[in-house]
Amino acid sequence: MIFLSQAQIDALLLEDIQGGDLTTRALNIGHQHGYIEFFLRQGGCVSGISVACKMLTTLGLTIDDAVSDGSQANAGQRLIRAQGNAAALHQGWKAVQNVLEWSCGVSDYLAQMLALLRERYPDGNIACTRKAIPGTRLLASQAILAAGGLIHRAGCAETILLFANHRHFLHDNQDWSGAINQLRRHAPEKKIVVEADAPKEAIAALRAQPDVLQLDKFSPQQATEIAQIAPSLAPHCTLALTGGINLTTLKNYLDCGIRLFITSAPYYAAPADIKVSLQPAASI
């Protein structure tokens, strides 16, 4: 489970409600008891539920029921029902709706990608990158995990990933073996992941025996060719495809033999459509 602190939950609420709801105050309805319900109009893999519930309880509302993160909801299914005073209900309305719409959009997009991949490779995986929309990293992470995806890198400090931009600063930027050996010496408990931007680089990298080789923006034909020769050059190396991988392009790579894909596309998926209903207790 991705942990969001109370301060982060408060920040999500404060984006919208720091001044309260003027309309509710002006109508003098804030003291009334009522319910709020969130429905997913189109169905799909849901996430953001636990965060949404924390936001609602922070406002003093009581959660009556909620689905689980990662569950497949039907079109029109209720995701959350909560109760409390109308002032709190109206304060939580849009802030929670925004979190649910964005999170569910991310998780359902990735779930569709995984379903497509696993029709061909049941053991296939999709890892999502650090390139999330600024300020959404933790929300993005919970959405990715809810859909069954992997976190590619949560940050720079705990994983090794050798890019061309690192190699540019080396004395010999084509010395893959030297760079990989140095990384193994100075980070002996870490897997060595490297990225190649062209087939020639990929072959040179494979000869240096990395643990994982990322192929960046390779065509399906180029990826297939590298996948065919990789076992003879580096039998223990895992191949991954990255760069431009999304729900539309993924199908073009399903014949190349690579089972690990790296993408940031789900972060930019269309938000889900969440319907919200607020009603006084007497009408429920």
Swiss-Prot record:
One of its GO terms (molecular function) is nicotinate-nucleotide diphosphorylase (carboxylating) activity. CDD domains: modD_like. InterPro entries: Aldolase_TIM, ModD, NadC/ModD, Nicotinate_pribotase-like_C, Quinolinate_PRibosylTase_N_sf, Quinolinate_PRibosylTrfase_C, Quinolinate_PRibosylTrfase_N. Its EC number is 2.4.2.-. It comes from the Bacteria. It is an enzyme of class 2 (transferase). GO terms for cellular component: cytoplasm. Keywords: Glycosyltransferase, Transferase. Pfam families: QRPTase_C (PF01729), QRPTase_N (PF02749). GO terms for biological process: NAD biosynthetic process; quinolinate catabolic process. NCBIfam families: modD. Belongs to the NadC/ModD family. Orthologs of this gene seem to exist only in pathogenic strains of E.coli but not in the K12 strain. PANTHER family: NICOTINATE-NUCLEOTIDE PYROPHOSPHORYLASE [CARBOXYLATING], PYROPHOSPHORYLASE MODD-RELATED. This is Putative pyrophosphorylase ModD. It comes from Escherichia coli O127:H6 (strain E2348/69 / EPEC). The lineage of its organism: Bacteria, Pseudomonadati, Pseudomonadota, Gammaproteobacteria, Enterobacterales.
